């Protein structure tokens, strides 16, 4: 059985580590000077969406700017992920990525709108998702 409190605690610790790094880089520039969009490539209401909303609330307070959760579901996460790739690489559009979308989809779909290695720069780890194939 999944212990939600344990998962939430791990997410919050990761969030703390992530925001510490962002805060030090923000001190060197005026970033962020506007709202940040956090794209979730899945429908609202799931674990990924809930995690994104918790993260956005806490990071928004920490950074002093609003974080907007933008759900872009479809094609096993490829639609939202592709939109992040096409966004300006200015740090104001972030992706809450998932192993399935970034690692498995390139091997399952013939034409995906991104290259996981070339198009993304990891910022931090939020949690783990256990995938079992039978």
Each language-model region and where it sits:
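Short Pro/Gly-enriched coil loops immediately N-terminal to beta-strands
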Residues: 118, 123-130
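Bacterial N-terminal signal peptides
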Residues: 9-20
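N-terminal (or domain-start) structured segment
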Residues: 26-118
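Hydrophobic/proline-rich hinge and linker segments of small-molecule sensing/allosteric domains
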Residues: 104, 110, 127-134
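Well-ordered beta-strand positions enriched in small/hydrophobic/aromatic, beta-favoring residues
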Residues: 94-95, 123, 133
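Juxtamembrane cytosolic interface motif at the C-terminal end of transmembrane helices
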Residues: 21-25
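N-terminal secretory signal peptides that target proteins for export/translocation
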Residues: 1-6
